[in-house]
């Protein structure tokens, strides 16, 4: 298992704050969202896997934004009108 450094991740992310947000969202997806890792799991924790994905350039802010789009979720349907606008 190779160590993941912040510098490795910052080659693919603009700043440390964005890195924190990106890695948090991805780790949460891996831990609770049922998303599959894009790198070998290697018995690591979700946070380490998320950082490895970012360091390899696999996970980007655009990737996370696409994964977060909720389509036709019945929980949110009650809060929209027929024009698909929030009530």
Curated annotation (Swiss-Prot):
NCBIfam families: rpoZ. One of its GO terms (biological process) is DNA-templated transcription. SUPFAM superfamilies: RPB6/omega subunit-like (SSF63562). It catalyses: RNA(n) + a ribonucleoside 5'-triphosphate = RNA(n+1) + diphosphate. Belongs to the RNA polymerase subunit omega family. HAMAP family: RNApol_bact_RpoZ (MF_00366). Its EC number is 2.7.7.6. The keyword Transcription applies. InterPro entries: DNA-dir_RNA_pol_omega (IPR003716), Pol_omega/Rpo6/RPB6 (IPR006110), RPB6/omega-like_sf (IPR036161). This is DNA-directed RNA polymerase subunit omega. Keywords: DNA-directed RNA polymerase, Nucleotidyltransferase, Transcription, Transferase. The RNAP catalytic core consists of 2 alpha, 1 beta, 1 beta' and 1 omega subunit. When a sigma factor is associated with the core the holoenzyme is formed, which can initiate transcription. It is an enzyme of class 2 (transferase). One of its GO terms (cellular component) is DNA-directed RNA polymerase complex. It comes from the Bacteria. Promotes RNA polymerase assembly. Latches the N- and C-terminal regions of the beta' subunit thereby facilitating its interaction with the beta and alpha subunits. GO terms for molecular function: DNA binding; DNA-directed RNA polymerase activity. It holds the Pfam family RNA_pol_Rpb6.
